[in-house]
């Protein structure tokens, strides 16, 4: 793989715009190469122009003499020193402060140009020509002067160095800002951990009273970092309970008195806590109980893990950009036969990007602190928690995916052949089968279609580098890829088709006047198996993903009482497209319960008043989830857009209720109500899909009527999916227009087709919804989760 593609693959996608623009610099180098090739073909062979005669010795000196000899040994050592400078950032602490912290660049000139020239000539061989001059101003911005700009074609090289300086300064500013941010966060984590240690002391010994002299060291506040070039101790150095003296260790406990000035922030995360805080309010006094300690330790654990991830990202950002500068300058040298990479890379090495080792030093402090305070001194367990889990691609997943897919296709063909051979479409029992058995199996079909659409979404999210695991908050290393989701969907399809084949008999036993009990219980057995797998406590069949799904469903069921997060309202949106699945579940209860005789394939569910009421309720429930979530977010965030979103779902609830009542009662009045409410809901939902969820239809954007940033390279795709979304939104017209059956389709099959089209529409919506969310994260450089800290000062909202 070429470096450009590898560079884009290894990027932190949310920081993509902050990386060096390797592609644009490479395009300028290609322009220089094309110009030089044309220049070589332009003049006739004899006699060469004077400019060519002047150029040949320079090329010989740079390529064979000074450039070859000086670029072979020193150039190679320069590249090695570049990699060593990055990988050994933790070793820079052992160097002298002058080299480690002062960003003195012998190639940059601020005021004394003679000093610059002195060092410059020491970096070139005697027969090498000085090509560039690099200056650094008071704002730590670098400007490169190309000294051979008067040459023919020199303006392109001037453009190259101007663009290179712009990218270098951009990277420097971003990196310095992020380092300052993590240093401030390290200060806050230090104070938070100091309070946590005091809380531990208080909980384990509530009556402890420590003399002030023992608390003096532990209570010493962390000094703010005025500059990162001073050899002051890292913020993590203040977190110490044990200090060595000459001969023994002296115990330095954290000051318990600091607990009088802070309070534990307990966000209600369970319905019981939410109701309790709504009724009683926040507790006025600290109890210093073990549950509070466990909660604080859990939050601090998550905060340290997330903070360590930030440091890893910064370290990767630093290394990749240094490597990109080395690669593009090497390509420039090869194209122009010059040796400009040596001075420029030396500047990079002595800049803040190459010489600041605060990130690596802070990483080692975080590791030591986390292992000591959260892993009981177990280095392996501590690093296992801090480092992200790498996902292993397993060949058996691909094998079983192919196996189950082949089985599903074979069974589908077998069903088609059996229906044709037996003439089941013209059988007397066809209507009985479609009214009783087909709705049972259609439930699994809806779930399988949704799984296939979700797998397609994951594939395209990965292809266009949408960071969906971060957006959904999946556990690192345990998130499912599209192969795993396809495997689950194909396995479910195999079980469903196998059950359908067992129930294809259309005639009862003439002796018993009933169907086989075993075959009639196959759909129920499949449903029970599906539920058992979903709630299986053993670590099989993607337990972490199953539990994540079950937990999200549970929070949706109690929507107003839980804080709304993206995975929960995203799942609730998925459930709004599975209304027919909920109705199929209701039919299961009725058919195998109070209203059916499964042995004779008869039921009275559609005549039951209870069933009719529940038929309406289960269709509204998914939209109620989203309505309640929007109200909760409106109350918490005070954003009026959540209120409008709640109105959108309320209009949909009214439309679904009106269509359901019209389906049961008919009549002109309910037809008018159904058409009116459905039209309003369709317009509202279509506007929200395109304008709000997808962020499209911006006429002033760089891409007219779309948005400024697009991940899909073909703009026509966006217009096609907008039209498709509107068309699929109108599937409700099948109900109000009274379309009961289509050619070769039973009315139950038609309902299943319409429901499947809604699932397909939801799958399309998913991709562009997450694309817009990802681009919002990119625009805000939001690559980390916000983890709340457990303690804050009394009388204020600030953390400790």
From Swiss-Prot:
> Ranges of Polar residues compositional bias?
216-229
Q: Where is the composition biased (Pro residues)?
A: 42-51
Q: What induces it?
A: Not induced by Pi deficiency.
Keyword annotations of the record: Cell membrane, Membrane, Phosphate transport, Transmembrane, Transmembrane helix, Transport
Q: In which residue ranges is the amino acid composition biased (Basic residues)?
A: 95-119
Q: Give compartment(s).
A: Cell membrane
Q: Which CDD domains match?
A: SPX_PHO1_like (cd14476)
All ranges on the Extracellular side of the membrane: 420-439, 505-520, 692-718
Question: Which Cys residues form disulphide pairs?
Answer: none
Q: Where does the EXS domain lie?
A: 606-800
- Under the cellular component aspect of Gene Ontology, which terms does the record hold? plasma membrane
Q: Where is it mostly found?
A: membrane
Segments forming domain SPX: 1-346
Residues exposed to the Cytoplasmic side:
1-398, 461-483, 542-670, 740-800
What processes in GO biological process is this protein linked to?
phosphate ion transport
Q: Which PROSITE patterns match?
A: EXS (PS51380), SPX (PS51382)
Cite the InterPro entries for this sequence.
EXS_C (IPR004342), PHO1_SPX (IPR034092), SPX_dom (IPR004331)
> Looking at the keywords, is DNA repair present?
no
- Hey, what tissues is this thing expressed in? Specifically expressed in pollen grains.
Q: Region (Disordered) spans which residues?
A: 38-77, 91-119, 212-234
Q: Which family is this protein grouped under?
A: Belongs to the SYG1 (TC 2.A.94) family.
Main function: May transport inorganic phosphate (Pi).
Q: Could you tell me what this protein is called? A: Phosphate transporter PHO1 homolog 9
Q: From which source organism is this entry?
A: Arabidopsis thaliana
């Amino acid at each position: 793989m070429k470096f450009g593609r590898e560079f884009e693959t290894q990027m932190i996608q949310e920081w993509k715009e902050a990386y060096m623009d390797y592609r644009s610099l490479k395009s300028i180098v290609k322009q220089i190469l094309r110009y030089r090739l044309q220049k070589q073909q332009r003049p006739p062979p004899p006699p060469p122009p004077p400019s060519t005669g002047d150029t040949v010795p320079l090329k010989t000196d740079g390529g064979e003499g000074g450039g070859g000899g000086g670029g072979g040994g020193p150039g190679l050592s320069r590249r090695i020193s570049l990699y060593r400078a990055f990988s050994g950032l933790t070793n820079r602490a052992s160097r002298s402060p002058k080299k480690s912290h002062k960003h003195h660049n012998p190639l940059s000139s601020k005021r004394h140009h003679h000093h610059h020239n002195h060092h410059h000539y020491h970096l070139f061989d005697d027969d090498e020509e000085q090509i560039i001059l690099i200056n650094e101003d008071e704002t730590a911005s670098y400007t490169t002067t190309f000294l051979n700009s008067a040459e023919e074609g020199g303006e392109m090289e001037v453009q190259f160095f101007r663009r290179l300086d712009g990218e270098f300064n951009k990277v420097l500013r971003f990196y310095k800002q992020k380092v300052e941010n993590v240093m401030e966060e390290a200060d806050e984590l230090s104070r938070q951990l100091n309070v946590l240690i005091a809380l531990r002391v208080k909980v384990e010994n509530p009556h402890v009273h420590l003399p002030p002299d023992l608390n003096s060291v532990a209570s010493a506040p962390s000094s703010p970092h005025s500059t990162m070039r001073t050899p002051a101790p890292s913020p993590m150095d203040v977190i110490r309970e044990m200090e060595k003296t000459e001969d023994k260790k002296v115990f330095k406990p954290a000051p318990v008195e600091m607990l009088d000035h802070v309070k534990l922030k307990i966000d209600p995360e369970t319905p019981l806590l939410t109701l309790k805080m709504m009724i009683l309010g926040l507790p006025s006094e600290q109890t210093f109980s073990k549950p509070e300690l466990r909660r604080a330790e859990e939050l601090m654990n998550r905060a340290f893990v997330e903070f360590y991830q930030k440091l890893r990202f910064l370290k990767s950002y630093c290394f990749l950009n240094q490597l990109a500068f080395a690669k593009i300058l090497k390509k420039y040298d090869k194209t122009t036969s010059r040796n400009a990479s040596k001075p420029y890379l030396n500047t990079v090495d002595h800049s803040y990007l190459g010489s600041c080792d605060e990130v690596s030093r802070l990483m080692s402090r975080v590791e030591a602190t986390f292992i000591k305070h959260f892993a009981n001194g177990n280095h392996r367990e501590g690093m296992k928690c801090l480092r992200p889990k790498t996902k292993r691609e397993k060949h058996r997943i691909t094998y079983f995916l192919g196996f189950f897919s082949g089985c599903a296709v074979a069974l589908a063909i077998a069903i088609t052949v059996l229906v044709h051979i037996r003439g089941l479409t013209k059988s007397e029992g066809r209507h009985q089968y479609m009214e009783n058995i087909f709705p049972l199996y259609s439930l699994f079909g809806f779930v399988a279609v949704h799984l296939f659409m979700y797998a397609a979404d994951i594939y395209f999210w990965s292809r266009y580098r949408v960071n969906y695991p971060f957006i959904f908050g999946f556990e690192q290393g345990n998130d499912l890829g599209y192969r795993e989701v396809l495997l689950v969907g194909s396995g479910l399809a195999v079980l469903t088709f196998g059950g359908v084949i067992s129930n294809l008999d259309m005639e009862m036993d003439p002796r018993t006047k009933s169907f086989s009990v075993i075959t009639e219980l196959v759909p129920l057995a499949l449903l029970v198996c599906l539920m058992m797998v979903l709630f299986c406590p053993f670590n099989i069949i993607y337990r972490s993903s199953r539990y994540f799904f079950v937990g999200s469903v549970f929070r949706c069921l109690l929507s107003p009482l839980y804080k709304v997060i993206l995975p929960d309202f995203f799942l609730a949106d998925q459930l709004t497209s599975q209304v027919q699945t909920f109705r199929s579940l209701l039919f299961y209860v009725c058919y195998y319960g109070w209203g059916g005789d499964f042995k004779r394939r008869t039921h009275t569910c559609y005549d039951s008043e209870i069933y009719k009421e529940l038929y309406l309720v289960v269709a509204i429930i998914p939209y109620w989830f989203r309505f309640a979530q929007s109200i909760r977010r409106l109350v918490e965030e005070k954003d009026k857009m959540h209120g409008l979103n709640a109105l959108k779902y309320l209009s949909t609830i009214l439309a679904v209720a009106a269509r359901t009542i019209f389906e049961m009662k008919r009549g002109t009045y309910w037809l008018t109500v159904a058409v009116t409410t459905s039209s309003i809901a369709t317009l509202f939902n279509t506007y929200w899909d395109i304008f709000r969820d997808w962020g499209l239809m911006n006429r002033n954007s760089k891409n007219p009527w779309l948005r400024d940033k697009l991940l899909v390279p073909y703009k026509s795709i966006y217009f096609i999916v907008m039209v498709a979304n509107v068309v699929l939104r109108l599937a409700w017209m099948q109900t109000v227009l009274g379309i009961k059956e289509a050619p070769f389709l039973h009315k139950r099959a038609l309902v299943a087709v319409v429901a499947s089209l809604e699932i397909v529409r939801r799958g399309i919506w998913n991709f562009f919804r997450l694309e817009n969310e990802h681009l919002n994260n990119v625009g805000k450089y939001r690559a980390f989760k916000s983890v709340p800290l457990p303690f804050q000062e009394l009388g204020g909202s600030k953390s400790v």
